[in-house]
């Protein structure tokens, strides 16, 4: 069985700042940042804050993808919600950064890129990059790879906000605020 790694909110925030530094140090200066809801939203906020602190101004939003129906269970189709703003404002000279917490199968990013190409057509930015805190190459079913990542792993990651699917004992042992959750 693959070991479970329980991530703390502090660790995820620090790694999100590390991810922001990787983007900044590469010389890439996004004009638009998209945090992919759910897990990519807090990572995207931290990356955007760090880049702005370093003088990089960007438009930033969250969009949602959906395909998971349970732990390790996905529907064949990835659904995407909330692209309207991007479709309205993107231009070829823009630089787009897509951010998620984990690049697992790659299906969500692949579907998002296809939807952006289909809807933006000639206005799709020439530069589109993908950043993620965790990259799982052994689970990747696409020909894509994130441009920026902090950790490469095959472990089962339990993010700070995740409690569904955990046992009471796991929550007690690994979740800050377990008494609030289990009341």
State each model region's role.
Residues 1-183:
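PRPP-associated nucleotide enzymes
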């Amino acid at each position: 069985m693959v070991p479970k790694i329980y991530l703390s909110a502090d660790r995820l925030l620090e790694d999100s700042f590390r991810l922001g530094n990787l983007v900044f140090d590469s010389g890439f200066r996004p004009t638009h940042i998209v945090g992919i809801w759910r897990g990519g939203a807090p990572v995207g906020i931290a990356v955007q804050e760090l880049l702005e602190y370093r003088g990089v101004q960007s438009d930033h939003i969250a969009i949602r993808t959906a395909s998971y129906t349970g732990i390790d269970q996905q529907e064949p189709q990835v659904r995407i919600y909330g692209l309207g703003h991007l479709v309205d404002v993107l231009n070829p000279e823009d630089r787009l950064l897509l951010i998620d917490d984990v690049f697992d199968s790659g299906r969500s990013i692949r579907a998002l890129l296809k939807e952006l190409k289909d809807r933006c057509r000639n206005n799709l930015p020439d530069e589109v990059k993908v950043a993620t805190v965790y990259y799982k190459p052994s689970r990747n079913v696409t020909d894509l790879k994130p441009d920026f990542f902090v950790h490469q792993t095959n472990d089962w990651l339990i993010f700070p906000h995740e409690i569904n699917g955990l046992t009471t004992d796991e929550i007690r042992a690994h979740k800050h605020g377990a008494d609030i959750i289990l009341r």
